[in-house]
Every structure is written in C-alpha cells, then in structure tokens.
C-alpha cells in the first residue's frame, strides 16, 4: 500500500480530465455537474433562455476562480431547426405588421399583440397574399388549408437561407459574450469570438447552440 502511489494516480486522473473534459473539471471546481461546454438556444432565436443564463452563471463563477483561463465562443446554427425557426419568426413579424396596418397603429411590429381569435384570419390573409406554390383543389384554385398546414407552408416559404443562419450563429455568440461581460463580470480581454458556422442536430446534441473552448 503506497500513499504516494494513490496521490500520483489522483494527479494523473486530474490531468487526463483537464485534457479530455476541461469543462467537466471546471464545473466541479464550483461544485456543479452541469455540462458547461455549450449553451442551447431556441430555434431561430439568439435570446438567452433562463436555463441558458443559469448555465452562464455557473461558467462565469468557474472562470472567476481561474483568472488565467480564456474562453473562445463559437456560435452555431442548425440548418433545419433554425431555418424553420427563422421562417416562423418572419411569418409572425408579417402578421403583426398586417394587424398594425389594418388598425392604423403607427408602432413597430414587435409591439403589436395578436390575440388567439385574430390569428387564424390574419394567417389566412398572409397565406393568400404570398406568392409561392400552394396545394390546389380539383379546379386549380388554392385549397382552403387548416391553420397548422398554413403555418408549416409559410414557415418553409420564409425559411432562413445560409447567410441568415450564419448571421444568427454570430448573434448568438455575441449575446453570450455580452452576457458574460455585463452580468458575469468577466473581462472582455478573456473572451474571444470565433466565426459562426452550421451544425446539424445529432441525437441529444442540438445544433442551435454556442460552443465554448478554453485557452
């Protein structure tokens, strides 16, 4: 039995963990088990969720305890989920603008509220006014469609293109950096933005996220 051997083995395990799973080691420093190497976003959004902010709080505490570490921040966008998410956001923006015009409101579309009662009629008007291939009835006119089907077709019609997705990925990274500076009290000199990119969702690994790496 060798105490020195046990200490050496623990030391080796820590080194291996620091190399293979640095964020797991970082989380354990502040008594947390959460995966800190990424933070997820809702499809089409670059606004941090409550759970995302809680994760950044943990990450900020860990970085405070290790002032020599620097963080690389890389925004990602899922070609499928985020493209559809951007399409839904554009659809809702147009619906709110339509209501504002109809009611004579001189306000931005984000400030317009659409009630559940108003929504189907506004959606139908938007669907009818957009120029894209739509399902036809037996005499060649556009078919009357259920709300869910119109939403799906309009989201596909307005779906984000590659440039939109890259822009979304970069905005996510910037949102994370801003949060860490303003609310996490992390020095800007320790935070580095990397170019945004596309990442497909694989299993439980969502593509609509921001990835972190340590320097």
Name what the model sees in each region.
Residues 209:
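Extracellular structured ligand-interaction cores
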Residues 1-206, 215:
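Extended terminal
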């Amino acid at each position: 039995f060798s105490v020195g051997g046990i200490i050496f083995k623990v030391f080796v395990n820590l080194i291996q963990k620091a190399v293979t799973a640095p964020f797991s080691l970082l989380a354990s420093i502040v008594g947390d088990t959460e995966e800190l190497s990424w933070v997820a976003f809702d499809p089409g959004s670059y606004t941090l969720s409550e759970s995302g902010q809680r994760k950044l709080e943990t990450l900020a505490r860990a970085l405070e305890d290790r002032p020599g570490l620097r963080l690389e921040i890389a925004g990602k966008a899922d070609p499928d989920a985020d493209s559809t998410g951007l399409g839904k956001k554009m659809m809702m923006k147009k619906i709110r603008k339509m209501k504002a015009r109809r009611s004579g409101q001189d306000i931005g579309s984000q400030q317009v509220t659409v009630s559940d009662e108003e929504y189907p009629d506004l959606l139908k008007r938007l669907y009818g006014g957009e120029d894209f291939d739509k399902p036809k009835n037996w005499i060649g006119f556009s078919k009357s469609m259920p709300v869910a089907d119109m939403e799906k077709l309009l989201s596909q019609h307005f779906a984000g293109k590659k440039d939109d997705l890259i822009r979304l990925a970069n905005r996510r990274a910037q949102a994370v950096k801003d949060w860490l500076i303003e609310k996490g009290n992390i020095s800007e000199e320790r935070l580095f933005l990397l170019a945004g990119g596309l990442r497909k969702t694989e299993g439980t690994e969502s593509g609509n996220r921001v990835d972190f790496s340590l320097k």
